[in-house]
Structures are given as C-alpha cells and as structure tokens.
C-alpha cells in the first residue's frame, strides 16, 4: 500500500510535530473531499450587513476611545509571509519572452509609469552600478529587460525574491515607505493603548525574518518619535506542525526524488495557531499589502475604530448576558431577551426545535465563543471570498466568509447567490479572543475541519494534490460569533501586481 509509513517517514513526522492520527485525517480528506456548504443567503443590508448611521458611528467611536483608556491589551496582527513573486509574474514573463520591447498592455504601462515608482531612485542607482547607465539611457537604448533584471534579480534590488512587506510602496519627502512601515504608522492611529504602546505582530517566513527585524531596528526610533509611543514589534513563523501532506492523483503518498514524503505549507489557515499564541484582548487583522499613504489614512482609521467600537459594545453585552446565565434562575423574559440578542445583534438564527430544558445551555454555548467584526466592501468583481449566511451542523444559521470553492457552482441557485453577492471580503477584521472571565479561548477548538481545500499542483514535472487548511478568516473562524459591517471601497487598496502601485491611491497626493 502506497500510504504505508516507513521508518524515515515516522522520523520526519516526529521532527515536524505531526501525529500519525493527523496524517491519517489528512489522507481521509483527500479520499473523501470536502463538502460544499449549505447556503441560506448572501449577506446584504438588513440580512447580516450592518450600515450604522452617522449618529450610531459616533457612539461606537466613543466606545472604542473609552476602551483604549481602560488598560486592555490591543495588538495588530499582520500576515506578512507571502512572497512578492506573484506581483511580478508579468515582468518575469517579459524577461522570458522572445521579444525585447514591451508588447502587452501591462508591459507598456509599467515602462510608461516607471518614473512614478517609489523605488525609482533606488532602481536608477542599481542600473548605474550594474550597467554604468541610468534608466533613461537604458530605455533609450531599448534595454528594457536589463531594467527589469535590475529590479527583480538577486544582483539588483532582488524584488523578485523579497516578501511584499519589504518593498517600497509609497513616496514621502522625508523617505519612502514599505508596507511594514505603513502598518506601524496606521497602528499608532487606532491601536495605541493607555500605556502608550503600539503592539504589532507580523507573521513572516523564516528566510526573511532577519530582514524584517533589521528594518524594524533601523526605523523604530524614527517612528516612535513621530507617534509619541513605544513600538512593541513581534514576529512568528508558520509552524511545521501545520504543514500538510502531498499526495498523487491516486491519493498515494507523493514521494520526492530521494524517497522522502513531501509536506507543503497549509495556507493562511495555519496562522490560527500563531493567533492562538497572541496574548491580547482585541486583535486587528489586516493583510500586509492593504495600505495607503498618510493623506488617505483618516478614512481607514475611522472605519477601523468603528469596527472595534461595535466589537467592544457587542462583547460587553455578551459578557453581561453570560453573567446573568451564571445566576441560574433566569426569568423567561431574560431568556427571551438573550435569544433575541443572539438572533438580531449576533446574526445567528437558532433552530426552532430546541427543547426548553436545553435552551439555557444552547444560549450559553452560542454566547461563550470568540467574536469578530469584519468590514465588507461593495463587490466590484474582485476575485476572492464574500459574506454569506450559512447553515451550521446544529441547524443554526450564522455569518461566514466563503470562497468560491466552498460553494456548489453546479447548482444554478447557489452559483447565482455567489455571483450576485453585493459584498466582498477585504480582510478587515477586529477580533476578541478572551471570554467573560478574562480567560483566552483556545482558537483551534473553533475551527471547522470540514472546510479545507484541495488544490492541484506540480513538482519536478509530476502532478500532485495539496491540502489547504480551513482559511484563517474562513473555516478557521467558522464557529466564532461574527458580525459584518459595510465599509467604503477606499479602505481596500491591495497591491496584487507591481502596476497597482501606479494607481492614484498609492501615489502622493499632489501627483494624483
């Protein structure tokens, strides 16, 4: 049998911290696949998406400002291990092409706007060092590929091998900034606690950790002075124990040339383990590439504070109700009020057939879990997940962020629900990680293991199947209390390709 473990396989499992039971569970997932989720509806206004009035927004902002003064620990959590290589896919293709001058729209746009790039002067110096000519001279001499090689190659700026967080994104008179630096500044504007500390945690890949540490060491003093606060920056790496086994198309072990098993990173869902080790009351989560220059930050900061204010208000009500339930003899009216809070405020529709003697236990179980409030933007056709009301195993219906692969696209009704969804997930979360007694939740307990993904890849010219764990904001938070809030599109400005840096939202105010 091609899934029998050899002695060296068991040694590898032990090194990685993966049990044989976990391995067997992964193999079962390949054999059985993952079920599609049963949809109730796409989330919409009055159906799971909050649209707070201006007056309500002010009340939530005040709630957050008050919370900041009360000594709670707040952390910003930024997944930053992704390599930037996908940003440069079109430029790598240009270097390999059998033509030497820009042909595609993307290539032409890149060279047309190159002078606007935040890394332009660095690239110019690099070209002078490598070729003894500046960018202008190289372009006049039709040496377009040499300019790209100076940007991407290890002998040049090495942008093709660095993580996104370390590339220059935005221009300022006193020095251009990377996304890491933008996150420091942004965090100082909504997550500075009463102790004047700004806590930010970056998840990074092992090979880049030193580069991140160096950037922080070089820049901390400057930004602490600007922000009038102490920067407390920490890092972690995805754990080897969250890697997943690769298999052949027949679900046998995929073995490498030396006969060893192949394990692959389990995707961003693995970061639930990193998040679980964060000691904080409130955690802001945002992707590394979704940052804007200072003149656009006020709107981002406003909505971050709004999400946080909604979260702490909901959390305080939840804690109040849990304490009432602790008192045992809750009145019928109180039980009714708690049920209404769960259904109306936490957007969780309870099953109709709960036995009366079980109701208090069900209400307690629904209340006593991690909580998140997520911003949602208008859907303009971006690839990625969206907000839905979904049936749970216990018959309840709650809010989830789903990817297209979790939805049965062969079912016309479900496909239409996905395609006609009004909102898109920009990865803009504020999370509460402790219970009403101040004890941290054990986050892996709230993952739905049936929400992973199977993807098809290749290695050394051979096809393989890979397993992605339930996504961090998808199935990994499936059993959290979840609330969605409409936020404007201006708060969502990711950089997916190098040309995105030429968009107005990433250019200096006076160059727009």
Task: Name every feature range the model reports, one short phrase each.
Residues 346-372, 381-385, 396-402, 406-512:
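Primarily single-stranded nucleic-acid-binding OB-fold modules
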Residues 2, 10-18, 39-380, 388-401, ...:
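Domain-scale recognition of functional cores that engage charged ligands
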């Amino acid at each position: 049998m091609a899934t029998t473990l050899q002695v060296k396989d068991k040694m590898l499992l032990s090194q990685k911290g993966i049990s044989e039971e976990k391995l067997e569970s992964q193999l079962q997932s390949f054999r059985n696949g993952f079920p599609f989720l049963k949809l109730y509806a796409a989330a919409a206004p009055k159906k799971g998406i909050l649209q707070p009035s201006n007056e309500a927004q002010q009340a939530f902002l005040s709630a957050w400002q008050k919370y900041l003064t009360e000594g709670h620990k707040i952390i910003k959590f930024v997944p930053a291990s992704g390599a930037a290589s996908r940003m440069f896919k079109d430029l790598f293709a240009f270097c390999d092409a059998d033509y030497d001058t820009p042909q595609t729209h993307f290539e032409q746009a890149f060279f047309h706007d190159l002078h606007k790039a935040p890394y332009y002067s660095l690239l110019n110096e690099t070209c002078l060092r490598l070729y003894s000519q500046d960018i202008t001279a190289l372009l006049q001499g039709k040496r377009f590929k040499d300019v790209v090689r100076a940007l991407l190659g290890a002998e040049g700026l090495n942008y093709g091998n660095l993580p996104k967080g370390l590339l220059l994104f935005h221009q300022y008179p006193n020095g251009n900034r990377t996304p890491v630096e933008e996150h420091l500044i942004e965090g100082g504007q909504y997550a500075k606690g009463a102790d004047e500390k700004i806590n930010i945690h970056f998840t990074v890949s092992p090979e880049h950790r030193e580069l991140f540490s160096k950037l922080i060491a070089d820049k901390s003093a400057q930004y602490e002075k600007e922000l009038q606060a102490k920067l407390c920056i920490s890092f972690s790496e995805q754990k080897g124990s969250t890697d997943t086994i690769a298999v052949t198309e027949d679900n046998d072990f995929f073995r490498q040339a030396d006969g060893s098993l192949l394990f692959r990173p389990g995707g961003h869902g693995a970061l639930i383990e990193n998040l679980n080790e964060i000691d904080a009351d409130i955690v802001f989560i945002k992707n590394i590439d979704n940052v804007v220059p200072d003149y656009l930050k006020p709107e981002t900061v406003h909505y971050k504070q709004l999400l946080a204010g909604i979260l702490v208000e909901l959390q305080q009500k939840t804690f109040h109700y849990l304490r009432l339930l602790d008192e045992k003899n809750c009145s019928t009216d109180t039980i009714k009020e708690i049920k209404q809070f769960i259904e109306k405020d936490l957007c969780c529709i309870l099953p109709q057939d709960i036995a009366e003697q079980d109701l208090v236990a069900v209400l307690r179980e629904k209340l006593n879990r991690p909580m998140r409030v997520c911003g949602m933007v208008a859907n303009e056709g971006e690839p990625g997940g969206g907000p839905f009301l979904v049936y749970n195993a216990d018959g309840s219906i709650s809010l989830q962020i789903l990817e297209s692969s979790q939805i049965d696209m062969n079912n016309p009704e479900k496909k239409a629900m996905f395609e006609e969804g009004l909102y898109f997930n920009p990865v803009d979360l504020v999370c509460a990680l402790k219970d009403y007694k101040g004890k941290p939740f054990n986050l892996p307990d709230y993952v739905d293991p049936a929400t992973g993904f199977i993807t098809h890849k290749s290695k050394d010219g051979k096809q393989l199947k890979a397993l992605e764990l339930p996504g961090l904001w998808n199935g990994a938070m499936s059993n959290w209390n979840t609330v969605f809030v409409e936020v404007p599109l201006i708060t969502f400005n990711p950089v997916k390709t190098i040309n995105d840096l030429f968009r107005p939202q990433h250019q200096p105010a006076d160059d727009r």
